[in-house]
Each structure stands twice: as C-alpha cells, then as structure tokens.
Amino acid sequence: MRTVTELRTAIEAAANHTTDESICIRWCALGGWWVWINAEDVADAGSLSEWLEQYAGLEEDELEFINNQDWEVVDDDGGLVGEFCGYSNGWGYFNCDEYIAAREALEDSRMDLEAFKAGLALGIPADKVGEAYRGDYDSDEDFAQQLWEDCGYLSEMPEFAQHYIDWDAVARDLMINDFQEEDGHYFDRNW
C-alpha cells in the first residue's frame, strides 16, 4: 500500500474540479485532508469508492483503508449536486444514487437547471419534476390567466366579461389545492 502522501497525490491528480457540479470531500483516513472532486465523475463511476478505483487508480487494500474510515462532504459548488449534499448528525453526505437519477431526469425533461431545482425544493421526486412543471410566471395571477387561456375558458366567454374576472381570487383558489410555486416556477401539486 502507498503512503498517505502518495494516496493524496493520486486522488488530487484525478480530482477534475472544473464545473459547478463539484463536492469537497474530507477523508479522516488521510489525516483530515480534503479535495474538490467533480461530482459528475463520481456519478459516472457509480460511487465515491468506484471513483477512487477508476479515476485515482487506488488498489483494493488502499480502497479498504480509506473506505473503512470516515469521510464527509464539507462543501459543494451548488448546481444540481447541491440538492444531494447535506448534513446529518454533524456529518456531511452526498447521495450519489439520487444525484445520478436526478441528472438523468433533468436531461430527459429538457428543463433549465433552476426550474428543475425549484421542483426538487418543493419535494417533487426528480423523475416527476418534468411532468409536474407548468412554466415560469411573474405572479400567481399571470399563471392563472395563462392557464385559463390554455384551457380555452377565456375563448368561451365574451370579451367584455373577461374584464370582470378577479384573477387574484382565481389564482388563490388554484394555488390552494392544485398548483405550487417556487421562485416563479409553477408545478402541479398532484404529481
């Protein structure tokens, strides 16, 4: 097995920290040493342990040495990866499996990252965010008016009557049961 310094060097050489999808890992086995790693590379490998093997070239005994001791995520660069890093019982973690699924769901949905993250913030599962998404609007009233237009309700009523619609009340009713909003992004509540 290589020395701790040699292990650090191998990991540092593989740590492609060039995107907004990076995580900072601290390894207790390596003396509390930390390094920024591209989370997309970790996801492509399948796990942090597999990344250490595939990207950093660690041998089985070296992997066992590192994996049998604590490690934690101490920071992230935001992006999508930030939604899958957190803290529990004082330790930082990275949920690689959920991050992998979310990357695929984001790509399939063809949504922009901020809208996708808004859906996740509302508690919508990553594989349902694209289906639940209704668009971006400046206000609940704008959303309600566009929804009624899309559903054909406005074309069915005389134009003079449209001026009497209380869009604030319509929006309030829609937002109570059927829809939810995060940072101007609107989603079905019943996904």
Tell where the protein language model's regions lie, with residue ranges:
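Acidic interaction surfaces
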Residues: 1-191
